Amino acid sequence: MGAVSAKYRRFARIAWGCAVRRVTFRPCDTTFKQDLKDHLLAPIAVRTPRLVKPASVGLEVVAWLVILTTVWSGYTVVKSGLNLYVYGTCNKENAESCTLGAEACAIPDQTPTFWGSIAEFDVIGAFGNEFASLGETISQIPTRMQNWDATEYLPANETYLATFDEAKPTALEVIDPGCQFCRQLFANIEEAGFENEYNLTYVPYPIEGEDGYKFPNSLLVTQYLEALRLSPADDGAGTSGADTEPAVAGDTGTPVDWQVLERIFTGETDNGVPFQSRINGLDTDAATALLDGWLTEFGLDADEVATIKSVAASDEVADIIAANKELVEDEIHTVKVPTIIFDGRRHDGLVDVDGLK
């Protein structure tokens, strides 16, 4: 009020002087509170004396609300800043809601929100979850300064987009086959020639939602990818030379799981619809038939396709997917997909072409 009204500027100067003394741990030697209250209540006392007491109470309530709002706003700014530094998003519970970070598909936090808990009259839980979340963020600050080595986070039976070269550094990306930003990252990787400079591998991570998965067929595609990684092949191109090597079909020397990803991320239907959008809109049976057709197109025979389909539904693949979930959430600690680790850094969200060069 002091900024726009001359009659309140005296109070503004007194208030700032008092604030400075408080910050420097000195007593506030002014009757500012009472002076301001008297100034505001004087017109009411003249016109309607009986309203002075309730108006005084109202001023106290408003004053406390202003204080609480200021404190909460300051806390929110600090928390958002820490989240932006650590996770690349000002809201780690819903990374997509923050426009300051890189574009990404959010990994939702299943913990009840502060106001959600308040609405359920769980005050203790609201503050407990809030400060636990802040504590977790603070504990992750060192990860922004650490040297990230992609080889320390490799999944089981990893495959590589190009032929593995021990002379090249390794890069690891966390992807959800249904996430549109993973598709954009793949396009940027190809445009930058990233796979020619790094041994690029991936962790398939289907993002869970409140009811099932964020993208309906992400789990199905992930099951097929892991089954393909488990399937033996005579050709070791695109692998690190593990005992169990993934299927490699055709003349490209590219593992079939990568061929599936490339089809999803870069291919289109005859009508020009991206295959990723197509798969996201299909029911399970139709998506399964589409994947089986691709495997046949990539050179697998009927028996091999049947084997892949069986392995995809196995407990072994389920265990691998569970291990990948733990890897992403508890070791990599990202809240955004895609996430890519290379050159000693963890990059959360979509990385542009220049950032990949």
Predicted regions and their residues:
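Structural alpha/beta surface segment adjacent to cysteine/selenocysteine redox centers
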Residues: 183-296
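Hydrophobic alpha-helical segments
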Residues: 1-28
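Loop-to-transmembrane boundary segments
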Residues: 35-69
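C-terminal cap of thioredoxin/glutaredoxin-like
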Residues: 285, 289-357
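Cytosolic juxtamembrane regulatory segments of multi-pass membrane proteins
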Residues: 24-40, 98-108
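Membrane-interface motif at the C-terminal end of an N-terminal transmembrane signal
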Residues: 4-5, 68-86
